[in-house]
């Protein structure tokens, strides 16, 4: 039998980032941590007698598809630490701008895109982790309709119920039920409250609505990630 302490985790992490006008702080935090991200996360995992065999990170950035032309920006998976430079360059290309005048953003659509990532199936133990940052409430998925970009329609759910079913029961997106984790940095508002109350394997850190998540730094985010793996 494999000893617990020798288990090696293959970790896929998808960072879902609100890149509307108020969110420059989080973009800078993620970029500044890129070089040491693997080492810092590995150190925190070692304290829990866990090891990372392979770490891949990708980004799904979002704005408001009802107000912004460039509403979703996706990267491929970058392997760490080898490709931290490419990851950092991608994050540096993200600009905090735009956002709908009505407040809500297209966060649930971005979460759906993240869930449909090309998740790893390799390794003794796997973790499929999504961490999402936003300081706004989400648009209802039911509102999307014809506004969903046609190229993305197959990966964006049309209702909160179907998104919930996919998280809890489905296998279409490739996330293993025992491996999936969701870490949310979002305000306690309608749209998020329903998700936090009903989704399993979900950790919520309440953010201040409209404040750009200024209260969070990468050290606390890394601690949360290590605890979720």
Predicted segments, located by residue:
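Von Willebrand factor
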Residues: 7-131, 138, 185-186
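Phosphate/oxyanion-binding active-site loops and adjacent basic polyanion-contact surfaces
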Residues: 23-34, 100-109, 156-162, 214, ...
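VWA/integrin I-like adhesion module and closely mimicked acidic/polar interface patches used
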Residues: 136-199
């Amino acid at each position: 039998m494999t000893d617990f302490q020798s288990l090696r985790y293959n970790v896929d992490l998808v960072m879902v980032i609100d890149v509307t006008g108020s969110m420059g702080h989080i973009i800078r935090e993620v970029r500044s941590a890129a070089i040491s991200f693997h080492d810092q996360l590995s150190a925190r995992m070692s304290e829990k007698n866990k090891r990372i065999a392979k770490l891949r990170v990708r980004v799904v950035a979002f704005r408001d598809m009802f107000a912004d032309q460039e509403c979703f920006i996706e990267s491929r998976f970058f392997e760490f630490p080898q490709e931290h430079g490419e990851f950092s360059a991608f994050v540096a290309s993200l600009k905090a701008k735009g956002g709908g005048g009505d407040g809500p953003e297209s966060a649930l659509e971005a979460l759906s895109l993240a869930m449909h990532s090309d998740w790893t199936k390799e390794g003794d133990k796997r973790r499929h982790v999504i961490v999402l940052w936003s300081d706004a409430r989400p648009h209802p998925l039911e509102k999307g309709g014809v506004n969903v970009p046609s190229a993305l329609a197959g990966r964006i759910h049309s209702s909160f119920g179907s998104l919930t079913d996919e998280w809890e029961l489905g296998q279409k997106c490739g996330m293993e039920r025992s491996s999936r984790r969701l870490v949310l940095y979002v305000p306690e508002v309608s749209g998020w409250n329903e998700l936090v109350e009903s989704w399993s394997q979900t950790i919520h850190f309440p953010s201040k609505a409209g404040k750009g998540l200024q209260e969070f730094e990468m050290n606390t985010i890394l601690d949360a990630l290590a605890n979720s793996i």
